[in-house]
Every structure is written in C-alpha cells, then in structure tokens.
A protein has these predicted regions:
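N-terminal Rossmann NAD(P)H-binding glycine-rich loop of SDR-like oxidoreductase domains
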Residues: 3-24
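NAD(P)H-binding glycine-rich loop region in Rossmannoid oxidoreductase-like domains
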Residues: 51-90, 94-96, 111-112
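Conserved Rossmann-fold NAD(P)-dependent oxidoreductase catalytic core, especially the SDR/UDP-sugar
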Residues: 89-132, 154
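Active-site Tyr-X1-5-Lys
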Residues: 129-157
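NAD(P)-dependent short-chain dehydrogenase/reductase
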Residues: 147-196, 201-203, 242
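Conserved C-terminal active-site "lid" loop/helix of NAD(P)H-dependent oxidoreductases
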Residues: 201, 222, 262-293
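Mid/C-terminal beta-alpha module of Rossmann-like enzyme folds, strongest
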Residues: 207-270, 303, 312-313
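Amphipathic terminal alpha-helices
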Residues: 287-288, 295-315
Length: 315
C-alpha cells in the first residue's frame, strides 16, 4: 500500500485534498497536524495522524518513511522568512535521509512577481516583488537543489484558489451584497474585464493527484494550474455569475475612459506586483501531459456562491 504523507492537511486546499484521498482504498495517509486539527478524517488503519510542529525535526522525521510520497501544502504565514526556510531545509533533510520517492510541493503562481508578460508560463523569468513572493520562490529552489538526485521534486503553482471555505472571491461576493448598486457599477466599470486569475480548488486538487500519480519522472519540474483558459475568469463576468446565483439583477458597467490606465496607477500605488489587467497564466504544460480539469469555472463559481449563501444564513 502506497504511503502518502501530507503537511498542511487541515488547510483550505488540504481539506479538499483529503476528501478526494479518502475515496482511495490503496493508500495509507500520514497527516501532520497541529494540536487541534480540523479534520473530518479520523485515525484508522489507513490514516495515521502525527501531531507536532513543522519546526520540530523529530516531527518531520516521524512523518516520512522510505518510498513514501510527500505532499507539502504547509506555509507558516505568521512566521518569518527564516523560519519558513528552516522548515523546508528540515523537510528536505528528512526526505533525503529516509529515501522519500516523490515530493509534490504546492507553491504559488505569483512567484513570477511583476513580470510585464501578458501570458505567464513556467519559463517566464520570475521577478518577485513582495517578501511572500521571494520566500515562496526560494522555497522552491531549496527543495529542488537539496533533493536533486535523491527525491523527485515536483512543484505545482496554483493561481488564486477559490472554493468552499476559501478566501478568494469573498471580497467580490461581499461587495455585491453590501455595496450600493451605483458603487458596484462604478467598481465594475473600473475593473471591467480585468483578469482575476482564479482557479477552482477542485482543479488544484486534481492537479496535485495527477502529479502525485504520474508515471513519468518529473524531477525539478514546475507546473502552473489556473482557470485562465476560461473566458469568464474576469471581474465583470464573475461578479455577474455571482449576481445570477444570488438572484440579483445583472451588474452593469458604464463606459470609463482610460479605465485600465487608472487601475494600473491604483494598483502600482498600493504596491501590488501584478498591475497588468490582461495577465493570464497558462496551464498548457500540465494539459500537454494529459491532465484534465475536474470542474469548469462557471460551476466552481456556482458552488462557491451556494456555500457563501449558506454561510450568510448561519452567521
């Protein structure tokens, strides 16, 4: 039985991943959790729960074993760059020492930083601007360089992941519910067809599972997963998809001259890395391997809208 060890199992992506993995009968899951895990899976013959701290080398050593597959979803957002790099160095060392077969590391597509390219691929030169982007890129490089020739490392770079219990799209939905129709139209006129670079969490999970199971050796390869191939993945169409699901009237956007120039200046002033309203992230490299998404963008937005509505009713 294949052993799969997971860090960040109680995270947003981790929760959705466990739902899919729980349906697999030929896997033994080893889950690293904190003291109060929010997991729907209980310890059993096929599920081992390791309680501990990512900064503790003993915890990491107890998580991995020879020949296992590691899925790393963890990032310590409240910790410093140095502490996050310490975790990664310790994880890499643990993988080397026991002989982990493959490590699938979940990074982020925004490591590309403030590139001016309209289409971002895995070959786009990264120009990270924020500390988060720089840390995430350095983590990728540490894993690849530390485990080269020892453990196969595959990096997955999702764009803005949304879905049930996720934070992306919350602001758009909140604005639709709370702002006046005029302010909503004004904001929509400004953002209009600006690409949102969203990706359904279901598709991120499918990509992780695909790369976990692929037979070809992909050591050191990076893969973007995005729903930017979907035309509606922009502000105007997405807010109207949500409006439809909420039973609201369509949001209209009046003409605003030089809207994207104004938006670029606003985003630049707020020190955002991506000020390009037309940026798309390409998943062609992943698709060329035979990967198929599990859900279309419109359906993902519908599911998010349904969860959001239920959340409002419970609050």
């Amino acid at each position: 039985m294949q052993v799969v060890s997971i860090t960040g199992a109680s995270s947003f992506i981790g929760t959705h991943l466990l739902e899919r993995l729980s349906l697999c009968n030929d896997l033994h899951l080893r889950l690293l959790v904190n003291r109060n895990p929010n997991l729907f899976l209980q310890e059993s013959e096929k599920v081992s729960i390791i309680r501990g701290n990512l900064l503790d080398t003993k915890t990491l050593n107890s998580l991995v074993e020879t020949g296992c597959i590691v899925i790393n979803l963890a990032y310590l957002s409240s910790k410093s760059k140095q502490e996050n790099l310490e975790v990664i160095h310790n994880l890499a060392l643990a993988c080397r020492e026991v002989g982990v077969a493959r490590l699938v590391h979940c990074s982020t597509a925004v490591v590309v930083g403030n590139s001016r390219d309209n289409v971002i691929t895995e070959d786009t030169i990264c120009q990270p601007l924020t500390e988060y982007e720089k840390t995430k890129l350095e983590i990728e490089n540490v894993l690849i360089n530390s485990l080269k020739g020892k453990t196969e490392v595959i990096i997955i770079r999702p764009t803005a992941v949304f879905g049930r219990q996720g934070r992306n799209l919350i602001k758009v939905a909140d604005d639709l519910i709370s702002l006046t129709p005029f302010i909503t139209s004004l904001k929509t006129a400004l953002f209009y067809k600006r690409r949102l670079n969203l990706v359904c969490v279901e598709n991120v999970v499918s990509a992780i599972l695909f790369l976990m199971q692929i037979n070809d050796r992909m050591d050191g390869e990076r893969f973007i997963i995005s729903d930017d191939d979907e035309r509606e993945n922009n502000y105007y169409d997405t807010i109207n998809l949500l409006a439809s699901h909420f039973g609201h009237k369509p949001v209209k956007a009046f003409y605003m001259p030089y809207r994207y120039h104004i938006l670029r200046m606003m985003l630049t002033a707020s020190k955002r890395s991506n000020v390009n309203a037309h940026r798309n992230y390409s998943s062609k490299k992943l698709f060329d391997l035979g990967f198929k998404k599990s859900i279309q963008f419109n359906e993902g937005v519908r599911r998010f809208g349904s969860w959001y509505n239920k959340s409002l009713l419970h609050n």
